[in-house]
Regions:
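Cys-dependent protein tyrosine phosphatase-like superfamily
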Residues: 2-98, 110-143
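Substrate/cofactor-recognition hotspot
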Residues: 105
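Short cysteine clusters
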Residues: 102
Length: 143
C-alpha cells in the first residue's frame, strides 16, 4: 500500500500490516475501508487542532464501515516508551491491516519504532521509517 486518497489523505505502508497517515476525516472513512484496512489507531489527542474530528466521531464513522478503532493519543514530541509497548500490543490484537494516524504521521511512526524494540532489527526500523518520510535516528537509544 502507498495510497493517496483524495487530496488530503496520504497513506504510506510502514509494514505489510501497518500504514500511517496524517489526520483522517470522517468523509474519507469509506475509502479507508475500501482500501482494505480493518482497524484504525488514533495517536492524536482530541482538540489538538480546531478542524480535527474527535476520536468519538472517528470511531462512530469507523464502525459504520466495519472498522475497529483504538485511541492511543500522545502530544507532539512526547511519545513515551510505554506508548510504544501499548501500540505493539494493539498491532498484535487488532485485525489487520491497520491504519495509524496523527497530525503528520510522525507520532504513529515513533510508536511503531518503539514497539519494534527487540522484535525488528534496528536497521530495518530506521529504513522503514525513512521510506515513509520520518527519521527515527534520534530514537536509537530508546529502541
Amino acid at each position: 500500500l502507498n495510497l493517496t486518497i483524495g487530496t488530503i489523505m496520504d497513506i504510506k505502508a510502514l509494514t505489510p500490516n501497518l500504514s500511517i497517515s496524517p489526520q483522517i476525516l470522517i468523509s474519507e472513512m469509506q475509502t479507508v475501508a475500501e482500501a482494505g484496512f480493518k482497524a484504525i489507531i488514533c495517536n492524536r489527542p482530541d482538540g489538538e487542532g480546531p478542524d480535527q474530528p474527535s476520536f468519538q466521531e472517528i470511531e462512530a464513522a469507523a464502525r459504520q464501515y466495519g472498522l475497529q478503532a483504538q485511541y492511543l493519543p500522545a502530544e507532539t514530541g512526547k511519545v513515551r516508551d510505554e506508548d510504544g509497548k501499548v501500540f505493539g500490543q494493539l498491532l498484535l490484537t487488532l485485525p489487520g491491516p491497520v491504519l495509524a494516524y496523527c497530525r503528520s504521521g510522525m507520532r504513529s511512526t515513533t510508536m511503531w519504532a518503539l514497539s519494534q524494540s527487540g522484535v525488528t532489527p534496528l536497521p530495518q526500523i530506521l529504513e522503514a521509517s525513512q521510506k515513509v518520510g520520518f527519521d527515527m535516528k534520534a530514537l536509537v537509544q530508546r529502541i
